[in-house]
């Protein structure tokens, strides 16, 4: 199992039990899933871009991505309903913990001009969303083989009831939040 999962079981649960005075260990918030999303709007005109994005996302997540399709037709973007315009991956279990560990120890330190993650990116229910402007911060991506630099949305879903609990959970994992 991933070291971060052991760290959660040994240290984070005890910290959260003391901080929020939960009656049971089962009340302690935990990370349930991580969703990675890559929107490729240019895929309408060039199908190879979507294939490139899918291979990059598969390398980052070690899982085959799902193609996302347009829900509505938008004439301004020349998109019809059902056109493939992106891809996403939902990570759970062992792969989720391994990705979270790589994100914290390798990928986030490689972000250019990084000043910390925003504390305002919580959704009101303890889930955290962040955007990465370049997929090349991940070591699995071969810099010479990329066709185009894509952005990446990362959604961390937790069982926390509030933003304060979610922030305390992610801060216990040593997420580099702004002061």
From Swiss-Prot:
A Gene Ontology BP annotation from the UniProt entry: translation
| Keywords on record | Ribonucleoprotein, Ribosomal protein, RNA-binding, rRNA-binding, tRNA-binding
Give the superkingdom in one word.
Bacteria
User: GO MF terms on file?
Assistant: rRNA binding; structural constituent of ribosome; tRNA binding
Q: Which SUPFAM superfamilies match?
A: RL5-like
Q: Which InterPro entries match?
A: Ribosomal_uL5, Ribosomal_uL5_bac-type, Ribosomal_uL5_C, Ribosomal_uL5_dom_sf, Ribosomal_uL5_N
Instruction: Kindly list any coiled-coil regions of this protein.
Output: none
Q: Which parts pass through the membrane?
A: none
The UniProt entry's GO CC annotations, sorted and at most eight, read: ribonucleoprotein complex; ribosome
Q: Which family does it belong to?
A: Belongs to the universal ribosomal protein uL5 family.
Partners and quaternary state? Part of the 50S ribosomal subunit; part of the 5S rRNA/L5/L18/L25 subcomplex. Contacts the 5S rRNA and the P site tRNA. Forms a bridge to the 30S subunit in the 70S ribosome.
Report the PANTHER family cross-referenced here: 60S RIBOSOMAL PROTEIN L11-RELATED
State its role.
This is one of the proteins that bind and probably mediate the attachment of the 5S RNA into the large ribosomal subunit, where it forms part of the central protuberance. In the 70S ribosome it contacts protein S13 of the 30S subunit (bridge B1b), connecting the 2 subunits; this bridge is implicated in subunit movement. Contacts the P site tRNA; the 5S rRNA and some of its associated proteins might help stabilize positioning of ribosome-bound tRNAs.
- Name used for this protein in its record: Large ribosomal subunit protein uL5
Organism ancestry = Bacteria, Pseudomonadati, Pseudomonadota, Gammaproteobacteria, Enterobacterales
Q: Which gene encodes it?
A: rplE
